[in-house]
């Protein structure tokens, strides 16, 4: 995304992240760097290389589906990333998400409401259930979704991702929200290895 700061400098900056919320973060970084006396060219080059794993990270594929992996795990970050996706030409937006266990229950309800508002279909699945039954977490989410959009519950996150990709048509978007850069699922005191990027590689490797 290309943007310009004001404050007496007309230098154009580019960041490898979509969305106005990332521009806001970048502007804050520019302000701090200027206060520290860094040259504008160094700031510009730094921002150009500021890709963050698991933050609006697009998985390239040959099927014409825009697949985005993002760490969004509350209503505000859900709204930010899904609103960002609406800025691009797209068909349906399919969102795959769950909610962390042993966290304020209202958080998962708020995320569900944002998903219902900004997505066309939801696959509800496991996030980090910790010590809370994943069935209870998913039930809370689907109750909040109600009949606002079509949804399915698939507890196995790998299978949930596969299902979303099977449903997607060229031009659609699939947003995998909640895990981002994390390489595990936390449940019952254990951190079980899990990488959404690896799951995506597995899926598309199987595709003709």
Describe the residue ranges of each PLM region.
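ATP-dependent carboxylate-amine ligase
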Residues: 28-208
């Amino acid at each position: 995304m290309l943007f310009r700061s004001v404050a007496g400098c007309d230098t154009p900056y580019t960041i490898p992240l979509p969305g106005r919320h990332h521009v806001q973060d970048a502007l804050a970084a520019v302000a701090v760097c200027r206060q520290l006396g860094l040259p504008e060219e160094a700031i510009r080059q730094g921002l150009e290389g500021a890709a963050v794993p698991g933050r609006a990270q697009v998985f390239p594929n040959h099927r014409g589906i825009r697949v985005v992996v993002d760490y969004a795990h509350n209503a505000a970050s859900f709204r930010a990333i899904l609103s960002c996706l609406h800025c691009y030409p797209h068909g349906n937006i399919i969102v795959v998400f769950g909610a962390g266990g042993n966290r304020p229950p209202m958080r998962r309800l708020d995320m569900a409401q944002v998903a219902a508002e900004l997505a066309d279909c939801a696959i509800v699945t496991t996030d980090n259930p910790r010590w809370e039954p994943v069935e209870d977490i998913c039930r809370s989410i689907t109750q909040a979704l109600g009949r606002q959009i079509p949804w399915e519950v698939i507890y196995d996150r790998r299978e949930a991702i596969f299902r979303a990709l099977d449903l997607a048509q060229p031009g659609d978007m699939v947003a995998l929200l909640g895990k981002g850069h994390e390489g595990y699922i936390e449940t019952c005191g254990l951190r079980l290895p899990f990488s959404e990027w690896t799951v995506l590689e597995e899926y598309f490797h199987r595709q003709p």
